[in-house]
Amino acid sequence: MDARSWVFVGDRKMSAKEIAWLNESLSQFVSSWQTHGKSLDAVGFVLHEAAILIVANENAVKASGCSMDKINHFVKDAGGQLSMDFFNRMNVLLPNSNGDFELARYEMGAQNMIHSAMQEWKELADLF
């Protein structure tokens, strides 16, 4: 399957009520989402209480620039309704030791990942 995905990470985690509202809004959006008059085969849902994931199957119909603009408008409007910013690309979801994901700023996440990688390299070097 040829698929295209879009991920928008918010600036905070959402409540259960907000997630339910957003999942319903996403379902309505993707069910009516079109490109040049043709319906797109897509799904959308909230990911890890803090992000929006939209995936389109592009085998039959490919998403166009206009249809991608519609995603951005939808996410911007949803963010306005929720008082959230889904367009700050410094927000990331990082796995934690519990197997869950937590919201972090890229700078902090990058430092932690670099530190972790350096520790692994040091441990490997100590073996030799």
Model region roles, listed by residue range:
Residues 19, 23-26, 51, 72-75:
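A general structural signal for well-ordered alpha-helical packing
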Residues 2-7, 48-57:
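Glycine-rich, often proline-containing surface loops adjacent to acidic residues and nearby aromatics
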Residues 86-128:
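Terminal interaction module
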Residues 1-7, 123-128:
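Short N-terminal secondary-structure initiator segments
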Residues 41-43, 81-91:
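Short, flexible active-site-proximal loops enriched in glycine and acidic residues
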Residues 10-38:
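Surface-exposed, low-hydrophobicity interaction/linker segments
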Residues 54-55, 59-84:
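Helix-adjacent hinge/juxtasegments
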Residues 38-51:
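Short edge beta-strands and adjacent turn/loop segments
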